[in-house]
Amino acid sequence: AQVIGADTAGHRRLVDKGFTHVVDLQEQAAAAFIPVKLEKPFKSLQKGRMEKKQLTSGDPSGFKPLKSTHERYAEVFRRLGYHAKPGPGDILKGEAWPKNFDDGMAQSGQLRVGLAPFAAHAGKCYPEPQMKELIQLLGAVPHIRLYLFGGGQREIEVLGSWEEAYPYCKSVAGKIPLTEELALISNLRLMISMDSGNGHLAAMYGLPVLTLWGVTHPYAGFAPFNQPEANSILANRKKYPAIPTSVYGNKVPEGYENVMESIPAKGVYNRVLEILQESQI
């Protein structure tokens, strides 16, 4: 990849590269000037901003599933004439267990489950008391091993304390580079995630991803790739009818601070057991 400025000199360099098409995958107005200068076919991502605005307006008539983000990206290339139809087989190949992460737990026959308990916004994070309840429930499952994912000093400290408290937990946070984290993820049986990046990374390897949704909702099109509806566990919309309050979870209206408390840990646990049983068939 190479970054080329959008000025006149940059346009000349693009011409020299011999490009035949221009694609804007950010739906940025400035990008429209590039194909004008280059006189090349141009297609832009359609994010569906108006649809998403209606979805997050609180108006019941706007509450309907929107096109997935994966499909929106594929659509751009189809409009250029390419075959782009993401399917179940479009996943990354699994990698070897990272050599630099010999935790004494990665033995054959064990159920390796990832747990990514954090997200960019508080309205998308499962409360710590319920997360600990879930961890304790999962700890009773024979041969289970939980690998904890996060980043940043505070998350590293929290996950480290959980590792000390629960012998079947191992924190990955801050211990190995991203490339090795990805290799580790590819060896898991399941990823439990918030509406956050770790779930998407796991889905890239074809893993089952169980996502817990707070003030956001999969109808906005950001559910991990190729996951069944049953793998989305939602906050109670009867109690919190304004969900989704925003697309990214950065807006938490008054009274919606504790939406994720409406997701019982036992319900998450039961779905984990179902997924693990399904993967053994």
What are these language model-derived features?
Residues 1-281:
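Catalytic machinery of carbohydrate-active enzymes
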